[in-house]
Amino acid sequence: MNTAKFRYIICKSFGHNTLDIKYNEGNRIITHFNMCIIDTDNNTFITLYNPNAGEITVKVEDIIELVPHKA
């Protein structure tokens, strides 16, 4: 996992772009699409939101994939 790359994407996307995210949650891999970053804690944790998934908080080191959403 490339946390430096993810932190860069988070910094560039905060308040501007929607993202697709795939991350580890225990023994499961979770995927959400078209998420907006609404908060970050010095890029250690990020909070994302979309109307379908609601609000989620993810530890940056648990992120597997973080890419700009493509319509």
Q: How should each PLM-predicted stretch be described?
A:
Residues K5-F6, I56-V60:
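Generic short amphipathic/hydrophobic targeting helices enriched at N-termini
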